[in-house]
From Swiss-Prot:
SUPFAM superfamilies, sorted: S-adenosyl-L-methionine-dependent methyltransferases
Pfam families in the record: Methyltransf_15
GO terms assigned for molecular function: nucleic acid binding; RNA cap trimethylguanosine synthase activity
Source species, domain of life: Viruses
Listed InterPro entries: DNA_methylase_N6_adenine_CS (IPR002052), RNA_cap_Gua-N2-MeTrfase (IPR019012), SAM-dependent_MTases_sf (IPR029063)
Protein name per Swiss-Prot or TrEMBL: Uncharacterized protein L320
Matching PANTHER family: S-ADENOSYLMETHIONINE-DEPENDENT METHYLTRANSFERASE RELATED, TRIMETHYLGUANOSINE SYNTHASE
C-alpha cells in the first residue's frame, strides 16, 4: 500500500498490511485530503482539472482562499464609485458605469502572485491582470493554474515586483495589490507589527507606487495586529479605508 504524507508529499511503503491499515486510518483522521484542500483554496473547477492544480506546502500555509479572495475583490469593487476615468474611456460613459462594469475596464497588478490565490479571482472581474511572482517554482505553478481556468487576460512575470513597478516602472496598471510576507507564524506575538517588502517598508512601497501617475489605488492584505496608527500617519495625504475580514485586514489606499 502507498500512503501519501500530505505535508511533505513523501511516498511511504509499509510491508505489513495491518500496519498499513492502522496508519492509513490514523492519517485519514489527522490529515486533510489534498484534493479537498484544493477545492477550498481555488475557484470552482471540474474535478479532472482540480487534480492538475499545482501548489506547494508553503503556499498552502499563506495563500488567500477563494472565499477571502472574493471578499477582497468585492472590497475593491465597492471602492470604485469615484475612481477617475481612464484615458481610454469617455467621462460621460464612465459616470454611467456600475462598479462591476468599471472593473472590466481596469488593469490590476498583483505584486505577490504566488500560485494564483487572488489572481484567479481578479481575472474573472478585471480587464487584465499582471501577475508577478519572484519564485521560479511558484511562477511555473501559477502559469499552470491560470491555463486550467482558461483565462487569457493574465500576463505573468517571473521577476522582482518592486523592481518592475517602482524602480523601472515597466508595467502599466490602474490598481496595485500586494500581500507582503508576514514573517512566518511568529508575527502573532507582536502587538504593533510593522513589515518590510523587499528593501522598503510597506508604507514606502505604497508611497512610491502612488507617486506614479497611472496608479490610482493600492490594496494591501495585512495581519490584524499591524501597526495601523503608524500606517495611517505615514500615508495621511491619501484616502485610506480599512476592512477587517477573517484573520486579515484589507487596506485600500486611494489618491482620489
Amino acid at each position: 500500500m502507498i500512503i501519501m504524507d500530505y505535508y511533505h508529499m513523501d511516498i511511504i511503503l509499509y510491508p505489513n498490511k495491518n500496519l498499513q491499515k492502522s496508519l492509513t486510518k490514523r492519517k485519514c483522521l489527522k490529515q486533510p485530503n489534498i484534493h479537498s484542500i484544493k477545492r477550498l483554496i481555488f475557484p470552482p473547477i471540474t474535478e479532472t482539472r482540480l487534480s492538475k492544480i499545482m501548489i506547494d506546502d508553503e503556499s498552502i500555509k499563506y495563500i488567500t482562499y477563494n472565499s477571502s479572495a472574493q471578499e477582497i475583490t468585492n472590497i475593491i469593487m465597492n471602492n470604485l464609485e469615484n475612481f477617475p476615468c481612464p484615458s481610454h474611456c469617455s467621462e460621460e460613459k464612465w459616470r454611467l458605469k456600475s462598479p462591476d462594469q468599471r472593473m472590466k475596464k481596469l488593469v490590476i497588478t498583483e505584486m505577490t502572485a504566488g500560485v494564483g490565490g487572488n489572481v484567479l479571482n481578479f481575472a474573472k472581474y478585471f480587464k487584465y491582470v499582471n501577475a508577478i511572482e519572484l519564485n521560479c517554482i511558484r511562477y511555473k505553478y501559477l502559469n499552470n493554474n491560470i491555463k486550467l481556468y482558461d483565462y487569457s487576460n493574465v500576463n505573468c512575470y517571473n521577476d522582482n515586483s518592486v523592481s518592475l513597478l517602482i524602480e523601472k516602472d515597466d508595467l502599466g496598471q490602474d490598481i496595485v495589490f500586494f500581500d507582503p510576507p508576514w514573517g512566518g507564524g511568529g508575527y502573532k506575538q507582536f502587538q504593533n507589527l510593522r513589515l518590510d517588502f523587499d528593501k522598503y517598508s510597506v508604507e514606502v512601497v505604497c508611497q512610491k507606487l502612488l507617486e506614479k501617475n497611472h496608479n490610482k489605488m493600492v490594496i494591501l492584505k495585512l495581519p490584524s495586529n499591524y501597526d495601523f496608527d503608524y500606517f495611517f500617519d505615514q500615508l495621511k495625504s491619501y484616502t485610506i479605508n480599512k476592512f477587517d475580514i477573517e484573520k486579515m485586514t484589507i487596506i485600500v489606499v486611494k489618491k482620489y
